[in-house]
Amino acid sequence: MENFVFNTTPSIVLQTGGLAKIADIAGRLLGKRVVIVTDKGLRKLGLLDPAINALEQADIAVSIFDDVQADPPESNVLALKDHILAHEATGVLAIGGGSSMDVAKVAALIAKSGETLNDIYGVNIARGPRLPLVLVPTTAGTGSEVTPISIITTGASEKKGVVSPLLLPDMAILDADLTVGLPAAVTAATGIDAMVHAIEAYASASANNNPLSRSLARNALQLLGSNIRTAVFDGQNRDARAAMLLGSLLAGQAFANSPVAAVHALAYPIGGHFHVPHGLSNALVLAHVLRFNLPKASHIYAEIAADVFPELGAVSTEKRAEAFVEKLASLSRELGVPQTLREVN
């Protein structure tokens, strides 16, 4: 048995309607002054209201930072840090997609530790400590609630990462109620994104690839593959929404410990230069990268093919990997995901 180290978020709660019980679930952890991090769109939709009401009823003071932008720039992180300090926050609660969670993770760290962003870019450079942190995803895709990674846009288009176990939150809450209103297009792109995380984690050439990550990746693919169509075409189905959230989380745990590869390497510059959402950037290049990798990775893709498409279990091993790649491309088209950069302007 190979040796490995595995790190993840220590407390995970899957509860439909859980946000309305946030004071009971995480009130003691967050303390008496909480900053909620989100974007203006989610605030306008009222998705924060259950959390605000629950916290205030528990005599916990709430301040809201709703200026998070897509592909968050450094200024976003610094503005949140200043907001946290101005309100003397005892805890940070992020409710949103990957951008909100990434911003919250870094700001909760530097607001407490006094480090600057330039101090902590890179791998395992941050010293900490950080404020108590709870993350609540509103999309099933990024897995940021269980990853020690935040990606920040520097300058016009360059992206830099902060990678540190200090970015793992104290708790992640998966609440399907928060995802039932997601448009089909967002559900599809973020769902494919989660699949990318699982596929790349399973196939990773990293020395950190390990049996636990591979097991999580396969479980993620089974959940995502069997629920993504329902989540896209019947968005009010809470069972499918919860399954997608869990699949995304498992994929996040997998790639947090067994790093992603070429799909993400190509997706980041697409997002940085053309402002294409990260999940969609991954979806655009997925099939192309898998086809390129087939000569060296066909045995790996054959192992996971039936996790997503059970009918491929009856296909010969020699043909299964190629069929897997083509069926992924077909699934992406079926879900309405754009296939070319031209389609996303």
What name fits each language-model region?
Residues M1-L29:
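N-terminal amphipathic/basic leader segments beginning at the initiator methionine
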Residues G141, L249-N282:
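Glycine-rich phosphate/pyrophosphate-binding beta-alpha loops
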Residues I149-S258:
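Carboxylate- and glycine-rich phosphate/diphosphate-binding segment that chelates Mg2+/Mn2+
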Residues S113-T138, L166:
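Short, acidic/small-residue loops that bind anionic groups at enzyme active sites
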Residues L19-V35, A54-A58, A86:
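Glycine-rich phosphate/diphosphate-binding loops that line cofactor/substrate pockets in enzymes
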Residues H273-N345:
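Gly/Pro-rich interdomain helix-loop hinge
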Residues R43-E115, I125, R229-R241:
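N-terminal small/polar loop signature for handling phosphorylated ligands or for N-terminal nucleophile
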